[in-house]
């Protein structure tokens, strides 16, 4: 999707000079007037609910996703509830320069991040060797490369503002995933990367949390091509509740948030089973979803 730059604000070129000192412009001082929370993948599902929760708790938002119309509708909804209208940045995180475009849009608005929520992600159902290779690499672009880029690109702002980073993983990241191999592997990366960043950012006062939900009834299921009706027992935590738990977990600086009792026990239970057994069980589960 073609990204349309936000209109840049004209900034006065005021300058200061004293006792022969070199002139310094306001632009060089780079005064930032407002802090915002950037949420990726905000146009649907958990991303939309996260936007609602953050806005309800007084955060000014910047929203990004591919679908500009949905972002605008959400921004108008949140503004109608009394908050300041979120900044809307329509772009596709599969594009290699998406991070640069987002950073430029935020700079043009004169804002800086105090929270970053890397929610965007997708998967496709079916054996990796049978699916389109470009499609599979696209999963890595969004779920891994873009998340890494934004986390590192804005780390200095999170440090400066003593903010927080919420990366959306999945309980799938604790498992091997035949039938959704690239997606499962991408979420394993998210968990490992986020836990490592947590240790690195802790001395700087930045909260870092990874959200690991199970299957949630959102548009993700349809896009992934997962058959309907097979996840009913696990679809017990609505997206809105997932978002509420994620927000509370981030504010409490929890290492990980796993919504739902059945999901919470997964990482613990896996310790007691051989890896081969887990692989076979996951493979059977995925075949049942066809």
State the predicted function of each range.
Residues 151, 186:
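Active-site helix of classical SDR
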Residues 119-124:
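Conserved NAD(P)H cofactor-binding loop of Rossmann-fold oxidoreductase domains
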Residues 127-138:
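Substrate-binding pocket helix/loop in short-chain dehydrogenase/reductase
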Residues 170:
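Residue(s) in the substrate-gating loop at a strand-loop-helix junction
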Residues 57-74:
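Conserved glycine-rich Rossmann-like NAD(P)H-binding loop of the short-chain dehydrogenase/reductase
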Residues 43-44:
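Conserved glycine-rich cofactor-binding loop
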Residues 210, 230-266:
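C-terminal helical subdomain
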């Amino acid at each position: 999707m073609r990204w349309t730059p936000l209109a840049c604000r004209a900034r006065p070129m005021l300058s200061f000079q004293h006792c022969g000192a070199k002139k310094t412009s306001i632009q060089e001082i780079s005064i930032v007037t407002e802090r915002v929370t950037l949420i990726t993948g905000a146009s649907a599902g958990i991303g939309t609910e996260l936007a609602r929760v953050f806005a309800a708790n007084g955060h000014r938002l910047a929203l990004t996703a591919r679908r500009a119309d949905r972002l605008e509708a959400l921004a108008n909804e949140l503004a109608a509830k009394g908050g300041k209208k979120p900044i809307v940045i329509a772009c596709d995180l599969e594009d290699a320069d998406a991070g640069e475009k987002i950073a430029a849009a935020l700079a043009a608005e004169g804002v800086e991040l105090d929270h970053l929520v890397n929610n965007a992600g997708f998967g496709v159902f079916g054996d990796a060797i049978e699916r389109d290779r470009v499609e599979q690499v696209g999963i890595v672009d969004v779920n891994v490369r873009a998340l890494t880029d934004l986390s590192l690109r804005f780390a200095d702002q999170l440090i400066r503002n003593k903010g927080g980073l919420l990366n959306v993983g999945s309980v799938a990241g604790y498992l091997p995933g035949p039938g959704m191999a690239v997606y499962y592997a991408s979420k394993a990366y998210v968990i490992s990367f986020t836990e490592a960043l947590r240790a690195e950012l802790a001395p700087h006062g930045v909260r870092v949390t990874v959200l690991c939900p199970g299957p949630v009834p959102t548009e993700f299921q349809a896009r992934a091509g997962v058959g309907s009706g097979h996840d009913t027992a696990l679809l017990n935590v609505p997206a809105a509740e997932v978002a509420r738990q994620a927000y509370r977990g981030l504010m409490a600086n929890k290492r990980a948030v796993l919504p739902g009792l059945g999901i919470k026990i997964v990482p613990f239970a896996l310790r007691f089973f051989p890896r081969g057994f887990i692989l076979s069980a996951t493979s059977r589960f995925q075949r049942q979803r066809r």
